């Protein structure tokens, strides 16, 4: 008889456990190293940083249940995604936890899939990235809550089944990520996407209706204000061409610039924020040569980006950004981006310039 030592048995058990983990969990992530030069109004800055350092766990607990846990370690450790998704059928899936809200088209995209290094101005301001409210927990376009999603209708186009009507609707705490809800009200967000029997083409409409605790000079006022958002747009993306445009608007109650020292005299005024953008890019796919099996991809991108912080304020003029960029994947784990933006803002004759270079390493 052949005997097995206790160490051999333990090693075999460890291998079996690891094999089961690999069958149900995928581990990935990426790191973004960025350099940015900015010049505006006579002021210059030159910044190098590790912008993101993501670690991402995805997996399935069963045929019907998926999960995701994603953290970011730059510039400070924080939880990005933490949710469980139950797939009842194609018409209904239930997602619970912290995740992206169903609002706008661009908000769906991971930074690794985004055409330029920065979101459009109005997406940042109204989709929960650098929110007009000034609340830092509105971050990464995410909230804590629950959401129903599904595909309500599909059709065959040139022999391939494509979704015609998709939806997402959720109930959220309304305070952003990694924080507890501090008000009785809950926020609602919804998005619907329609493909008009054209493969790779979608039309989208979405809304967000909520309240938040208004800040003044960085401190809570104890007063709840409206935080309403609306978006409509379209996108064509056939893995070669991408063309997308969206109009986004929002109504946000803000504390006035000169409130009375008496808290009872605090002046709250609505700000009507709006903007739109149009972006286009095309992928070139080519090899390194006959002796190198790897492929590389290159995408030039152009974007027009209009934004106005407060339409009700006659002194607040539009901010218009003209961006051009190159996105290069020398191989599937490495991305290099180079972006230039001409910024026309606040005064017609005042221009700013931003040059950004970013290297992403995916694992």
Write out the residue ranges for each language-model feature.
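Outer-membrane beta-barrel pore domains
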Residues: 41-42, 68, 98, 200-363
């Amino acid at each position: 008889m052949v005997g097995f030592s206790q160490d051999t048995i333990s090693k075999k058990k460890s291998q079996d456990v690891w094999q089961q983990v690999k069958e149900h969990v995928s581990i990935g992530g990426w790191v973004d190293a960025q350099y940015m030069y900015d010049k505006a109004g006579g002021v210059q800055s030159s910044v190098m940083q590790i912008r993101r350092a993501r670690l991402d766990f995805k997996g399935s607990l069963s045929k019907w249940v998926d999960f995701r846990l994603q953290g970011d370690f730059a510039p400070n450790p924080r939880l990005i995604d933490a949710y469980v998704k139950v797939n009842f059928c194609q018409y209904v899936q239930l997602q619970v936890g912290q995740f992206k809200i169903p609002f706008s088209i661009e908000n769906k995209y991971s930074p690794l899939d985004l055409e330029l290094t920065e979101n459009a101005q109005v997406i940042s301001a109204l989709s929960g990235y650098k929110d007009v409210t000034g609340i830092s927990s509105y971050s990464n376009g995410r909230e804590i809550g629950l959401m129903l999603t599904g595909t309500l209708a599909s059709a065959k186009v040139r022999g391939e089944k494509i979704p015609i009507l998709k939806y997402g609707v959720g109930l959220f705490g309304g305070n952003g990520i990694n924080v507890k809800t501090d008000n009785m009200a809950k926020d609602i967000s919804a998005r619907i996407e329609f493909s008009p029997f054209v493969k790779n083409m979608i039309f989208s409409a979405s809304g967000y209706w909520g309240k938040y605790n208004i800040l003044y000079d960085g401190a809570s006022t104890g007063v709840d204000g409206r935080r309403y958002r609306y978006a409509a747009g379209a996108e064509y993306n056939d893995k070669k061409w991408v063309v997308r445009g969206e109009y986004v608007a929002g109504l946000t109650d803000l504390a006035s610039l000169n409130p009375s020292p008496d808290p009872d005299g605090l002046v709250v005024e609505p700000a009507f924020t709006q903007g739109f953008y149009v972006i286009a890019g095309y992928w070139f796919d080519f090899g390194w040569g006959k002796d190198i099996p790897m492929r590389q991809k290159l995408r030039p991108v152009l974007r027009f980006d209009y934004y106005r912080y407060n339409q009700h304020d006659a002194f607040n003029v539009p901010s218009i950004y003209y961006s051009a960029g190159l996105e290069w994947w020398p191989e599937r784990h490495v991305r290099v981006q180079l972006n230039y933006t001409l910024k026309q803002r606040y005064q017609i004759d005042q221009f700013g310039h931003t040059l950004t270079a970013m290297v992403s390493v995916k694992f």
